[in-house]
Amino acid sequence: MGSISPLPLTPDASCCPREVILEKYQQERKKRQLNCVPDNEATELHHKYAPVQGVDQPSYTRSPIITDSKVVIIGGGLAGLVTAVKLKTQGINDFVILEKGAECGGTWHWNQYPGAACDIESLIYLPLLEETGYVPQSRYSSGAEIRAHVARIILKWNLGEHICPLTQVTSTKWDESKLRWEVQTDHSDSLTCQFLVLATGLFHEPNLPRIPGSERFKGDQFHSGRWDYAVTGGDPAGSVPMDKLATKTVGVIGTGASGVQIVPRLAQDAKKLYVFQRTPSSITARDNYTMTPLMTEPVIQKPGWQRARMVQFCEMLEAEEHEMSDKDGTVAEGFDALSLRKVLNGMRKDDVAPAQMGELYARADISLMESIRKHVSNTVDDHETAEKLKPWYPFLCKRPVFQNDYLSSFNRSTVELVDTNGQGVSCLTEKGVVANGKEHEVDLLIYATGFDYEIGTPFYQRTRIHVFGSHGQTLDDAWADQGPSTLFGIHIRDFPNLLYIGPCQAGVTFNFTHTIYEAADHISHVIGDCLKDGASFQAIQPSIEAQSDWVKQTEEGSEMRLQYAQSCPPGYFNGHGRPEKIPARWGYYPKGIKAWANAMRECRAEGMKGLERW
């Protein structure tokens, strides 16, 4: 299946007038805005249906660890593992990785639902391919292939001896008198370290909505990020059917990225499937195929090929002038829809006036969304169902989803879309789900309702970790009023020797592995410089001036971003419909990932410019 064709700057003649479309966008946003109440607290139901350690985890007891290390890394996902490898490359082996799950892998450990897969090209998403010599089997790797690669990384660099699994960090505190971080866990561990790396990830803490009657439902229920194969049958690899669903009626609440991947597999195996939708996703095709040596060998021959390919992907999305051969261009195939960004960057280079820029961008956006809505009509047989599956909002309001089989699943007689007209489900009963005033009886209910995302969400809510800085203030308290203040999104004043990996104030592209690479490079070099023999300092933090300047850069263009977010239906990108409540400094670094990486390299080249040392 091909990707959506490149965009014209004006809508197709066949689509509705622009004014009609924009009015439709506003109507759809308003009806959802009135019924959007984000859940900010964990409840007993949260712990029951989305347990911290997941389902079927082994019991794990051990003696408390009391030790001092150079580095403690919190999180054994891709960010934590890549950072660990980079530390070893710097000759630093005195580190501990604390992981709350039974295994490492982060997002891919928790999200083992059927159909879980990456929609970024595997050659740039799977980290450390060049170093391990592994070539992915598919253009877009399955969750099973990614988890196998995580195990490969751990084995190659002997990281197993550094990892403490099933260990939830509860608090960390900076001791200025000792220049050490104190780390406490749920195993009564007492660790100290000179450097603390927060690699706590993005999609691991389930967002479980408070639906009245959840405790009364008599069937099974769980969050998609804590899939229970004992209930469904099957396995994470998808090698066998979910045979226990053959006689069951299943309900799925949520049609975001996870729900879209789950539905096709459930449609195959369940006796009956109800899909409860508040807001439809924008669905485009994903052209997956087996990677052959003929395809990969020209790519992987040159040293440094993976980093170079990540940069090529970034350059294509940021519309930079770059000569690329046909085979290089395959890195962004399927991302033609993201040429919106090229439109925007092209206007910036041409010094288009801001007022005119918004107009041209809106036209391009409408054209793209008309293409996506037409794709729905061409795929879904039933006209009424197709109309309900059409997204009516600007393209980047919600995460774009690339999936071939989701829309066609609704052509099955056993699959029924329950569109809630933007209101969400009303409540649960003993037998099922009430939506639109009607009870839908189900045997199993699956919450594909996403995760607590970083932007605008308190750190403790996402991690269950209190982080205390040099003045006894928590990270959440420090950021409560105006939002985050950082240098590069990594260093935080009054939290010495703390190094943070996340999207906030950092360079971000659709391939978050690229962000991880650049952050891990910087972190490992900074720690390496501090630990060099003869180093005259043991602690670092950003200067007031450097941090303030970085925050100011992050806030640039915030007015245009706010205006766009206000046009969107509620979601985690816009604070669940209240973007004005989220300070601009929660945003990404607006100049892009390459400028971000260059700024960090300049810092290191100029003797850690912008960092105080003592």
UniProtKB/Swiss-Prot annotation:
Its EC number is 1.14.13.-. Keywords: FAD, Flavoprotein, Monooxygenase, NADP, Oxidoreductase. NADP(+) binds at T255, G256, A257, S258, G259, V260, Q261, R278, T279, K398, R399. GO terms for molecular function: monooxygenase activity. Pathway: Secondary metabolite biosynthesis; terpenoid biosynthesis. Its cofactor is FAD. Binds 1 FAD per subunit. It catalyses: gamma-lactone-2-keto[5.5.5.5]fenestrane + NADPH + O2 + H(+) = penifulvin A + NADP(+) + H2O. Pfam families: Pyr_redox_3 (PF13738). Coiled coil: none annotated. It is an enzyme of class 1 (oxidoreductase). The record marks R399 as: Transition state stabilizer. FAD binds at E99, T107, W108, H109, W110, D119, Y125. Transmembrane segments: none annotated. It comes from the Eukaryota. Disruption phenotype: Abolishes the production of penifulvin A and leads to the accumulation of gamma-lactone-2-keto[5.5.5.5]fenestran. The keyword Cell wall biogenesis/degradation does not apply. Baeyer-Villiger monooxygenase; part of the gene cluster that mediates the biosynthesis of penifulvin A, a potent insecticidal sesquiterpene that features a [5.5.5.6]dioxafenestrane ring. Within the pathway, peniC is responsible for the final regioselective Baeyer-Villiger oxidation of gamma-lactone-2-keto[5.5.5.5]fenestran between C1 and C2 to form the delta-lactone moiety of penifulvin A. The first step of the pathway is performed by the sesquiterpene cyclase peniA that generates the angular triquinane scaffold silphinene via cyclization of the linear farnesyl pyrophosphate (FPP). Belongs to the FAD-binding monooxygenase family. This is Baeyer-Villiger monooxygenase peniC. It comes from Penicillium patulum (Penicillium griseofulvum). The lineage of its organism: Eukaryota, Fungi, Dikarya, Ascomycota, Pezizomycotina. The gene is peniC.
